[in-house]
Amino acid sequence: MITTVLFGAGQFGAMIARLMGTDYAVSCFADNYEGKWGTRLAGIPVLSPEESLKPAPDCVCLCVMDEERAGQMEAQIRKLGFEGPILRPNALKTFDARAAVMRLLAEQIHEENIPGAAAEFGVFRGDFAACINAAFPDRTIHLFDTFAGFPEEDVKIEREQGFSRARVGDFGETAQEIVEKRLPHPEKAVFHAGVFPGTFSDCREETFALVSVDADLYAPTAAALPLFWDRLSPGGVLLVHDVNGTQFVGAGRAVREFCREKGLLPMPVCDLHGSVILRRP
């Protein structure tokens, strides 16, 4: 076994721990924040960088995506005397677990002739919407977003409940025109711009086969789940983002409440932001 220290005890690090192959044995996390030392993340102890290297691990994996930060962390590890291999999870920029799962679900939906449109709530600049549009070239895709960032009423709930540090206007660096240019089949897209659920009225008679819910915050996620779930075809899927992450815990709260009410068991996806699948029986 290759004993490994994961440097960076955050959301990314927790997912890297789950993605490590069977040849690797994670001994601990290392982190520069003293407040995390002596705690556990994903059941793995968190130590200072100095303490993490004392057992002489075989390798260190840097749990950050930012290249500048990764360079700083690598220099720190070398300065502490570690001479072994240092891994950078750059492949995760190329291979996307959530997109792969969505494509597999789309293939299954086509094979089983599950009827319904596609949709995404929380479009931002359209990267994932473009993937869905490509996977369902002959189906309508409904796209819901304020296209102006987080609205004040939703952010207020986040702050009052301590769900996140969201700010009004976050993720506002977008526009419908930007998204349209990214879609491979823009003629199949129907845009619903504004604050959800007020923008859902035109879809009350719609049926869905696959819906991506990526609203980040508690209130819009809680509002979206029953509206889309009740309109899913049998075998249809909700793919919900940020459920098992640490940046936006309100989305996870909304999903857990909804699943308890409906008697559902969410199926986790091993992507970087803790997505889950909810499938209609």
Where are these regions (language model features)?
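Hydrophobic, well-ordered beta-alpha structural blocks that scaffold small-molecule cofactor pockets
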Residues: 1-115
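S-adenosylmethionine/decaboxylated-SAM
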Residues: 88-93, 103-107, 111-281
